[in-house]
Amino acid sequence: MDLLNSGLRGSGPWALLAPSPRIIALLARRAGRMNPTMALVETSAGYPPVEEKKPFEEPPAVVVTPSDPWPRPYYLDNGLRRVAPYHFTYNTYCKQRWRGREILDIFSSEFRDRPIEYYKDAMERGAIAVNGKPVESISKIIKNGDVISHTLHRHEPPVTALPISIVHEDEDIIVINKPSGVPVHPAGRYNYNSVVEIMRAERGHGWNPLPCNRLDRLTSGIMFIGKHAKAAEALSLQISGRTVRKEYIARVKGKFPDGEVVCDMPILQISPKLGLNRVRANGKAARTVFKRLAYYPPEQAHDNPEQTELDKTRPPMAKEGYSIVRCLPVTGRTHQLRVHLQFLGHPIGNDPIYCNQRVWGTRLGANDSDATQDTDEDIITRLSRMGKSEVADAVAYHDEMVDEYNKKKAEKMSGELCEVCQTPLYTDPGEQELSLWLHSLRYEDAGGSWSYVSPLPAWALPPDGMDGPTEVGGMEELVEAVKEDNPEIA
């Protein structure tokens, strides 16, 4: 215990990387002793001091950190919140599809973010273990019940340095305005750079934030965080009960029609792995109400003799300017707003999936409910081929954005290696990897007992030299369009 405590405080020479209690118990039973052997990782002598609720101003002076470093090793740089690399141990049981396969084959095919040479080296130096013991051969066969451990030097992607601002707080809940590009929960390459962990770092290691609603990583806006389980459960049930109105703001391509537009097209998930959904007759029922808030024409006329070559290659909708659209989702299907806007011919302008000409062609999937333009297999194949060096033409109507994005995406890997683990390092994310022009603007109880609204994001405000709305009125006109069929939100 003294060893563990001193390691976690960073004041001792070693820190433990412990498996979960369930895995500890399993390994202990197999080994016939109270505790399994755990990996010891050397760590530096400490962390720089940090003010309460304030991230590091400079990178922490650590190269190797414990698996649960505290304070979290955040620092701010170039408008981004970064996490200093740290050692982390993943533990997993053998999955059914892994049974009878060689361990190197499993890692090289299932975890393709690193080359096969890395996994060979990791096995040779004992960073990959099975049932608490180093792998003696890269040809080791994995069987049912095996526990596989992988200790690695973890590099998290940076996220925006914008703060998680508080809209409302009481003894039960916190209402936040989530920045775009920050995932809610730890997932994939993101761990400490998540809403849950950032808020924990600000309020204390023992504090457990409980998200009550869901927002995609790229979506910004209103989120509810429960302070205790009872409050989180009650609010989650209220939201799922469809008596809570939600309003989003989107920036879409072209001039969106006047008046209220109701889209009732069903949505089908055609690729869970890629997170891809399409309008399909055999999909789940979905309904959204849209209303244009503002339209901003392009800065450059179509017949301008000073058009650049890039201007001439832009799709027609891109040359028609863009609209700011209010969105009221009556149902809550995955990617519902993005899919419905695409179907209506006005996809979100920087959507990396549904406004991507390399995937959907120049029509971008508009009014294609029967897959007459492209089959699902065609779309899945094209989306799967989008590699690290490719750029989505979805953003090709802003010269400055395209130039910067091409520079970022053309060299996804920086060409540099980590001095500790020799992992290839990524360049910083471009603007399109940090934001989506979709914002959760408002949540309110249909009975009128509460309502929370966030400010309009910068991309929804009038551009320089143009007039337009800077705030949004009530939801009555949106609700009016569907209240007969959906009285629960009236």
Residue ranges and their predicted role:
Residues 2-490:
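RNA pseudouridine synthases
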